């Protein structure tokens, strides 16, 4: 994962030159975020490294704070990058993690899972998994890190929370995940514990 909330001012000229001269043939054709957070630049760089879908495609996972999900006005850099990802149907899942997992911050974090070779039943949908309660306390705190995700392969008495999370993602069961809803700009506008009225599914349509 990239460092949270790191500005990219020192790289600004190089990045904007690539954006303007290469467009979508380069890494940053979808746009650039605000100067004080380069997370979505890092994500675009990773997407550029994905194997082409006709060659088998790729799946990537990246840990972000909440900023790439929620910040940016309609038509702004963050919004346009999200729109590009949603329109290409690359976002497969978002996993909300427990707080206090990292040494130097206690903020909320999320795993983004992206794929350019989605299985047919996942196409046009984004799965949101709420894993905020899948934690066990650290025996000894390390800075802000007071929790970890239970993993019996590491500590045999742990609950298998990693297995639970990966199982939810793999099974893609209706009703087992929450809904994430996007506006026309690809911005998350609401996250609900239940599906919209009249629809019991636990996945959201991205279109």
Question: Where in this protein do the model-derived segments appear?
Answer:
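A conserved structural/catalytic subdomain of Rossmann-like adenosyl-cofactor enzymes
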Residues: 2-207
